[in-house]
Amino acid sequence: MIDLAPLARRLAGTPLADWANGLQAQLDTKMAKGHGDLQRWQSALDALPDLQPERIDLLDSFTLQAECNGETRTVLRKALLGLSPWRKGPFNVFGVHIDTEWRSDWKWSRVSPHLDLKGKRVLDVGCGNGYYQWRMLGAGADSVIGVDPNWLFFCQFQAMQRYLPDLPAWHLPFALEDLPANLEGFDTVFSMGVLYHRKSPIDHLLALKDCLVKGGELVMETLVVPGDVHQVLVPEDRYAQMRNVWFLPSVPALELWMRRAGFTDVRCVDVSHTTIEEQRSTEWMRFQSLSDYLDPADHSKTVEGLPAPMRAVIVGRKP
């Protein structure tokens, strides 16, 4: 059982206290419904060897170090491979390098210089396996809660938390819609790689704003296209082989959406093209990846003939 009592204690006396006190029952209900692969993933978690990190780096990477013999490292590697595919990372865990599909550390190096997370209560929406949550703690956040309904990501987070049990990071297997309206308790809210999956992007922005305290900051990272304030791409069917992609705005259009949703001080801090070095298949994620989704003759286009993935980071403040 996942014990959320430390989370409730952490949030006592904050605007999130009432919500936190009800989370254990909400999580237990969700866990009772389960998932067909949960037992297999739990077996992988149970196989993780008992190790105590002697050195922890979350600021410049995710690295845990300790004395670890070859036999123990082999057991560790096998257990972690049992939680494949690994999408976000990389993680270096006692000498086992989890070479994830995404070089999420590259994205973090583009995002983090523009933020001040020291002492902040942070919510990461669509947090994946929690890689960024650990890096947010490394950047000085007071506490980080991630929500993502994917059970494998939940288990991957538990694997890392096994070795960092006292750090104030929690992964809840919930969707944003499972959170109560008007939480208004987080200093910083992240939504990275989520907006284009939403049929109603404005509603998503409004829901994110509801989670923020007054003066809180939204960090929005999403796929964008070139163009002016009127340019928005709606794929006819798939985009880069993904069916669930709805709206890809230009940067000026996204900035307008955020202002219409009530954010102020809206500004774009980064735009970058996703490369096949940043997103690729590895031993830890053996399925298709970006190179399979691009036009083999022209990497500026997807296989559908649409503009290749370009991602922007926009920040804004709740007045």
From Swiss-Prot:
Keywords: Transferase, tRNA processing
Binding site for carboxy-S-adenosyl-L-methionine: K88, W102, K107, G126, L176, E177, M192, Y196, R311
Top-rank taxon, per record: Bacteria
Enzyme type, top EC level: transferase
EC number: 2.5.1.-
Stretches that traverse the bilayer: none
GO BP term, example: tRNA wobble uridine modification
CDD domains assigned: AdoMet_MTases
Stated family: Belongs to the class I-like SAM-binding methyltransferase superfamily. CmoB family.
Subunit and partners: Homotetramer.
Name of the featured protein: tRNA U34 carboxymethyltransferase
Organism: Pseudomonas savastanoi pv. phaseolicola (strain 1448A / Race 6)
Gene: cmoB
